[in-house]
């Protein structure tokens, strides 16, 4: 078998290098690596594109159910809020935020979000929601499942809680996810729902479920996260698109 050793192959003309002919198999041996940022099929259709750092874009719609990383923000010093003002548009019908190990500065307060229709100039979109949770104290003294009106928003423009009564001890935090549907639509109201797990302020656990809607036909193009009282001390928030 003949072998060709080279560091670079370039086409004599145009921008296409053809390896083999119809019916041939081009094999990459075990341990071999093919590096590229854009993968296309024989018809020139892009299957996906990478930015060289592992973030994909332009993913072909045939890859149904893919989770596409958009951006993330890590809170390493105390801040009043975290805003996502880009990446929320009509590209995907569903967006998911993951909030991980979010710790607040204030005891017995609520972590939540609000939406914007003007790229983050204002966060005051009218919304309504339902909220229920299960709580249990660490010492086993009490526990309950309840419809929690503290987490409700009744056609209001303030924050929508995803946790209520969160503690702020050094080892207390919350984690969860928020699903946001068709935020770029100018026809529908924008549905959302969240599920969260966190430390309750009386040394207990809270498991919560929330669902609701942004009562606007305008596109939601930014989301802000904050506590009802006090700063965010630490944690990471991720944004993904779902194909």
List the model feature ranges, each with a label.
Residues 25-26, 104:
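Short, surface-exposed beta-strand-loop junctions and turns on beta-sheet-rich folds
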Residues 29:
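Acidic, glycine/polar-enriched metal-coordinating patches/loops
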Residues 2-3, 10-12, 20, 33, ...:
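Surface-exposed molecular-recognition determinants
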């Amino acid at each position: 078998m003949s072998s060709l050793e080279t560091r670079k192959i370039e086409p004599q003309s145009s921008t296409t290098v053809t390896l083999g002919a119809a019916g041939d198999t081009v094999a990459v041996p075990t341990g071999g690596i093919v590096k590229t940022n854009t993968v296309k099929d024989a018809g020139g259709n892009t299957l996906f594109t990478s930015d060289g750092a592992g973030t994909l874009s332009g993913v072909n719609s045939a890859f149904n159910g893919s989770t596409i990383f958009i951006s993330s923000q890590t809170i390493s010093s105390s801040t009043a809020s975290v805003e996502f003002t880009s990446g929320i548009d009509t590209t995907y019908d569903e967006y998911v935020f993951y909030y991980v190990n979010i710790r607040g500065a204030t005891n017995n307060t609520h972590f939540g979000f609000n939406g914007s229709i003007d790229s983050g100039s204002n966060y005051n979109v009218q919304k309504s929601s339902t909220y229920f949770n299960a709580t249990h104290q660490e010492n086993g003294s009490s526990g309950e499942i309840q419809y929690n009106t503290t987490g409700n928003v009744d056609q209001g423009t303030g924050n929508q809680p995803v946790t209520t009564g969160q503690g702020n001890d050094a080892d207390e935090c919350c984690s969860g996810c928020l699903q946001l549907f068709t935020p770029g639509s100018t026809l529908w109201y924008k549905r959302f729902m969240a599920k969260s797990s966190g430390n309750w302020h009386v040394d207990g656990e809270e498991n919560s479920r929330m669902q609701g809607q942004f009562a606007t036909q305008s596109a939601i193009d930014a989301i802000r996260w904050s506590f009802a009282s006090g700063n965010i001390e630490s944690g990471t928030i991720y944004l993904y698109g779902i194909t």
